[in-house]
A protein has these predicted regions:
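Bacterial Sec-dependent N-terminal signal peptides
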Residues: 1-22
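Beta-strand/loop-rich accessory regions of lumenal/periplasmic or secreted enzymes
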Residues: 24-29, 36-41, 48-236
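Low-complexity, Ser/Thr/Pro/Gly-enriched N-terminal "stalk/linker" regions
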Residues: 25-30, 40, 234, 252-321, ...
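Short, solvent-exposed loop/edge-beta patches enriched in aromatic
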Residues: 53, 67, 77-80, 92, ...
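Solvent-exposed loop and edge beta-strand segments that line ligand/cofactor-binding
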Residues: 226-230, 310-329, 375-391, 437-453, ...
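Short Pro-Gly-centered flexible turn/kink motifs
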Residues: 231-255
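Well-ordered alpha-helical scaffold segments within catalytic/enzyme domains
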Residues: 329-345, 391-409, 453-459
Length: 459
């Protein structure tokens, strides 16, 4: 069922006519509100649509019990999309969390999901310790985790995309004393939540306010924590308005879905250039201090210190890393290029010292980069990664091309890079892929991952 049929069906339910409203049941749209008294567990109330007559609102969400808050809803047609506008007024002081679900009619197993900057397809390429289908097939997240507060569902079978986007102005947020469970907001927030859920096998777009994250919250890299649900105070007599937009399109494949969603989001949000007090030139000048303050020149391979950096002190550390976080060689190229542009001989000199030291001391016995060296701990990591090795080669190719354009040649580096590319060919699999990790003797380090409950159910 498409959005137009769905919303028109809602209108029929509340007494508004629509020629294309067919096959609607009240289960297509659902909502609930959780109310909390500080110090006590919240109580969730399922809500039901109720028709309104002679009112400024089309319909109202009501519970079986009398609530200290009234919730109205309008559905507005806008450029072929449907805007859901929620109006909420408190009859007494109340801490609340409101949520709504719209079922797409698509089988959840036939769908791929997209939340810009956070979720792609089913996120199965992500580790089990990150948000993915390894943990659950339903996810709700804070809107500010995303590049735009939007969730899209792509039905592979019927080649249709359904999305919901928040349209309110995101102007504020509030602190909490806890990061998980039911949390009381210290003030006003603009941040709601968005996501997708499997409701009895049907994919649904889920959204609400204020934010919550479920079934887990992602607090830092590879760390899933228990879910969180925020409660905001709405004082007696205060009102709140919330707006979301539902959108539907026929799409050929998931790649086109991503492109379409970005274009739709851009057109909807109309982002404007942000005026800043500092010019790009000034910011580059300030950021170039990193090349000065982090440079370590008393080790066999010189490097810029950044791995395991303590932000409280910014003291140099003993870790020299090629690629990934350390990205020493790419930083050296950037410092060289910027240094020559600005006639900064200190940057240029240190950049060449890094390249020269890595040429002499930066390789393993076989000829791969010593990609991570712990100098004070006198330890060189023996397992290589295709990411760091390839990022090192990438940096060197930029360096050699830049030097060639300046009329400078480095035959020893060129010989090294050609040798490394030949070794990469030895590692390459028949399907064109590369092993993620390997040792200096070209033996592959097996990837160990626990099988998720979701994967087990598929077998």
């Amino acid at each position: 069922m498409n959005w137009k049929n769905l919303v028109c069906s809602v209108m029929l339910l509340v007494g508004i006519t629509c020629a294309e409203a067919v096959n609607f049941t009240p289960d297509n749209v659902s909502a609930s509100i959780a109310l909390k008294v500080p110090g006590n567990d919240a109580k969730r109330y399922p809500l039901t649509l109720q028709q309104l007559d002679n009112s400024n609102f089309e319909y109202q969400w009501v519970a079986a019990d009398k609530l200290p808050v009234v919730i109205y809803q309008n559905v507005e047609e806008k450029d072929g999309n449907q805007r859901i506008v929620i109006f909420m007024t408190a009859l007494d002081d109340v801490y609340f969390n409101f949520g709504e679900q719209v079922m797409t009619g698509c089988h959840h197993d036939d769908c791929l999901f997209y939340m810009p900057g956070f979720w792609y397809r089913r996120n199965l390429r992500s580790p089990q310790e990150a948000p993915s289908f390894h943990t659950s097939d339903s996810w709700l997240v804070r809107e500010d985790r995303l590049s735009t507060p939007l969730t899209a569902i792509f039905d592979e079978k019927n080649r249709k995309t359904y999305s919901v986007i928040r349209l309110d102005n995101m102007a504020s947020d509030a602190l909490t004393t806890h990061k998980e469970g039911e949390v009381i907001l210290s003030g006003k927030t603009s941040i709601g939540y968005t996501g997708f859920e499997n409701l009895s096998g049907i994919a649904s777009l889920s959204f609400g306010f204020p934010y919550k994250e479920a079934p887990k919250t992602y607090i830092r890299k590879l760390t899933l924590a228990p879910s969180v649900e925020a409660y905001q105070l709405l004082r007696k007599g205060e009102s709140l308005s919330l707006t979301w937009e539902l959108h539907e399109s026929e799409i050929a494949d998931f790649s086109e879905c991503v492109q379409h969603i970005w274009e739709y989001s851009y057109d909807t949000n109309c982002p404007q250039i942000v005026n800043t007090p500092y010019s790009p030139e000034k910011m580059k000048e300030v950021m170039s201090n990193f090349f000065v303050e982090s440079f370590v020149g008393n080790t066999p391979t010189h490097y810029y210190s950044g791995v395991e950096l303590r932000t409280a002190t910014c003291d140099q550390t003993d870790v020299a890393e090629v690629g990934f976080v350390g990205r020493t060689l790419l930083n050296a190229f950037n410092a060289l290029e910027y240094g020559e542009q600005q006639r900064r001989t200190d940057l240029v000199t240190n950049a060449y010292k890094i390249f020269d030291s890595y040429l002499q001391n930066g390789f393993s016995e076989t000829g791969f980069f010593n990609e991570v060296v712990h100098y004070r701990r006198n330890f060189v990591e023996s397992v290589h990664s295709i990411r760091r090795q390839s990022e090192g080669v990438y940096a060197l190719l930029h360096f050699l091309n830049y030097e060639r354009l300046q009329g400078r040649k480095h035959p020893e580096w060129e010989k090294r890079i050609k040798s490394m590319l030949d070794m990469f060919l030895r590692l390459q699999n028949k399907d064109g892929s590369f092993p993620r990790k390997f040792k200096d003797d070209f033996s592959i380090v097996p990837k160990i991952r626990k099988q998720s409950q979701w994967q087990s159910q598929l077998q």
